[in-house]
Structure formats: C-alpha cells, structure tokens
C-alpha cells in the first residue's frame, strides 16, 4: 500500500508568531527561521478554499516574486506547500505604510515627494525589466522597511501581477483598484506596462496635495473621469507646486498609453533626478492635513470591507455563502461602519477635492443575455432567468482591489458568444453557426440517439431542412446558467432550457432539456468545441 508523504518543511523550519495582516483567503504572520533566528513575514494561504484558478494565481504570484530582487521590493525568500496551506515567506517590513509615515513627519516637502516617487519608480522599472506588470500600485502596497528615518520604500503585494513579453499589449483581464485604474483597462483594451505608470501618476498627485486626481462616490462617474483624463491642478494648493512636478504628472497621466512616459524616462525627469535644485523645499502642511483625512477614509473603508468579509464571507468579485452562525452583534458592527462611512464620504473636505471638470455621466448598458436551446427548434427570443453567476459588487470602495473582474468579464463573454451562436441558429444561418463552432465539434444530443456526433454535417441537415424553413414563434427561458472558467482559454456553461413553441396542430407546447457547452478560445475567438443535450428529440425523426 502506497504511503502519502506530507510536506512539513515550513512547520519544521519556522516558528509562527502574531498576526500582522489579513486578507480574504490568507493571513500574514511574523515568523522566525529556527536555524538562523532571522525574522520574516509569512503569508499563509488556506488552499482548501481555493479554486483551480486561484491555485494558478498563487503559483503565478510565487513565480513572479521569485524573479524580483530589488531593494525597493519586498523580497520573497521561500515558497512552501503543506497539506491545506501554502506559505510565502517574505521580508519582514516593520515601518508600516508610506502614507501613514508621511503624516507623522514634522517636515514634508515636494523634495520628499520626489524621493518617494523615485523609489517607487525604481521598483516599477525593475518589475518592467523582468517582464512583470504589478497592476495594483496604490498607497496600501507602499511600505517602509523600518521605523528608522530615511527607511527605504518597499513595493508589496504581487497578487495581481502578470508576466509580459517585452512591450506586449494584450487584454489580461479587468483587475486593479478603482481610483488607480488606467483608461485602457476601463475601456477593456489591450494593455501592458504603462498601466503601472498611470497608477504612479495618481500616487504622485496624492503625494503632493493629499487627495486623488479622480474622485466620485459613483464608481461609474469615477470611471468616466479617468477615461476622459479629467483632472486639474486647482488653487490654492497647486499654486505652490513647481511646474516641473505638474509636468511629470501630466506625462504619467497621459490617456494614450503609447505616449505615456516610461519608468526609465520618468527616473530621468529633472524633478526626480535633480530634486535638490528643481523640487521645492517648502514644508507642505496643507498636504499633510489632507493626507491625514485621505488615510482615515482609506482605513475606514478597509474596515467596512473587512467586517463585511467577516459577517458575510463576502469579497469583491466572489459570491459565497455566509456562515449560518453569524452573530447579530457583528452584523450591527457592519451597519455602524456603513453609517460612519456615509457620514465621512459625504464630506468633500475630508481629503477629497471636488472635481471642477469631470465628464458627464453616460450610461453604457450591457445585456447579459445567455441563450442555449435545443438544436432543432431554436428560439426567436431568449431570456436568462435567475442567473446565479451574477457576481456581487462591493459597496463604494475606491481603495478595494478588484480581484476577479477578469473572471467575471470572461463569464459575460461566454454568455454573449453563446447568444451569438443561438442567434445564428435562430436565423437558420449555417455559415455564421460554423464560424462560432470548431470544425471538429462533438456532441451528444437526443437527435443522435445516444451516439457521439463529430463534425458539422449532422447539424447542417437541420439547418437546411428545418431551421431555415421554420417560421413559427418560439420562446426560450434559460434557468440557472452556470459558467465555469477553466484557465485562460477554456470555459463551460451549463443550464436548464425551457422551450415554448407551437406544434403542427397549432397547440402551444413546452419542452425541457439540460444542456452543457464547452468553449475554447483560439486566436482571441471563442469556439464551441462540444455540447451535451438531454431530453427527447425535438425534431420529429421520420
């Protein structure tokens, strides 16, 4: 009988101590390596709760962190899998967040902001040279190595980072934190390294005045501002900022990513590399005051989300079941925090300047209709009823990372592509249908009497002899569609399908089938490679 050997290397080599941070599926604890006595931070991921896709993301994060060795990046020292848990052993950084340190300083000037952004840009440049795009640059991920004066800035959290080849631009999914997202990501266009520079521009703007360039409580309006590049330098606070600093911000917040300054170029900007003569040395007390309010607002919103996670097992981009034993006291805490948030968020003076030239709110409505009825009698109208794959959004939270928007977008893509396939069937358009299907499409369907059918000829028969000639009204309702994303280029959709139609005697009929379609993406296009349909044959086999 074979014996399963369970790895216990982390347990054997490290001693765990107090918690120093928490996430939706992980906790960070201080640890000590027993043989050396050196302190580290262990990110402990509960792998029992992870999906296959989450496992892929974890492997990607570890792979990326192993690549990066720079004085301004939190370094990964070890990556260990044990039964039920994965341990990522990082530098222990004890200086806290950069933004929290700034507000505690007695003196803070433009030159200090220049030194901060220089270190951030050095970290970003190293990432880009190693073919890594961080995708989630924001204040929460900018830490200080220690409490000592002049401690190095450290870039942390590569959970959303991706690997790219050179200056490759592609659609890597909708991911990041709302206030720091670039226009190209919001437009769902191909993107790459320039997204990190855009986020650096937002961070630099905040470093100089203590509030962000783009702001609106309505996330849609916020996104409209970002896509339009609608920011300005209002008086009086910007009057004391040097033109060179504003110039660098403008080059970072350039809408066209091809024209946006690179990390290498930004480090050569006079305001960065010649700060002693170019950047102002004047103390910026108003910036410090605004930054205190900005920090307080970030922390409160973080507390609200953490409480929601605790009380509802809820995270951005995921929908899970709340524990049955949740206390009403915890629920009350959530409501109390929400009320505090409303009070704080309604005060424009609290670290957020109102926009003077924000764009008009224009609504773009996408219909998440999915539709997959039986092969013989496809509907003219399709409806999704009770779509269980609808993913909950968080409450207004511009500092909350959107972790699974890419998966959500892919699910909607699958539904939309399936709808296009059904549209082709509805129209009796075999040519359009064939473009969406793999030439070697396989299927199990009632019409094939339990046999596996391969290729398009079997389906062509129904197009030419039934579908193209059908003129009677048909209505389909799709019940409880589930989309399973399988890696980057595969997905499966399953659903119950009700089809209403008029039979040959003019009587209304309803048929039900349970169906599954498997999709594979090739050359950027989804193709149906297999489907399985249960039930009785819809078309009369005579």
UniProtKB/Swiss-Prot annotation:
Entry's Gene Ontology molecular function annotations: ATP binding; calcium/calmodulin-dependent protein kinase activity; calmodulin binding; protein serine kinase activity; protein serine/threonine kinase activity
CDD domains on file: STKc_CaMKII
Membrane topology listed for this record: Peripheral membrane protein
GO annotation, biological process: activation of meiosis involved in egg activation; apoptotic signaling pathway; calcium ion transport; cell differentiation; G1/S transition of mitotic cell cycle; long-term synaptic potentiation; nervous system development; neuromuscular process controlling balance
Functional description taken from the UniProt entry: Calcium/calmodulin-dependent protein kinase that functions autonomously after Ca(2+)/calmodulin-binding and autophosphorylation, and is involved in dendritic spine and synapse formation, neuronal plasticity and regulation of sarcoplasmic reticulum Ca(2+) transport in skeletal muscle. In neurons, plays an essential structural role in the reorganization of the actin cytoskeleton during plasticity by binding and bundling actin filaments in a kinase-independent manner.
Subunit structure comment from the entry: CAMK2 is composed of 4 different chains: alpha (CAMK2A), beta (CAMK2B), gamma (CAMK2G), and delta (CAMK2D). The different isoforms assemble into homo- or heteromultimeric holoenzymes composed of 12 subunits with two hexameric rings stacked one on top of the other. Interacts with SYNGAP1, CAMK2N2 and MPDZ. Interacts with FOXO3. Interacts (when in a kinase inactive state not associated with calmodulin) with ARC; leading to target ARC to inactive synapses. Interacts with CAMK2N1; this interaction requires CAMK2B activation by Ca(2+).
Name this protein carries in UniProt: Calcium/calmodulin-dependent protein kinase type II subunit beta
Biological source species: Mus musculus (Mouse)
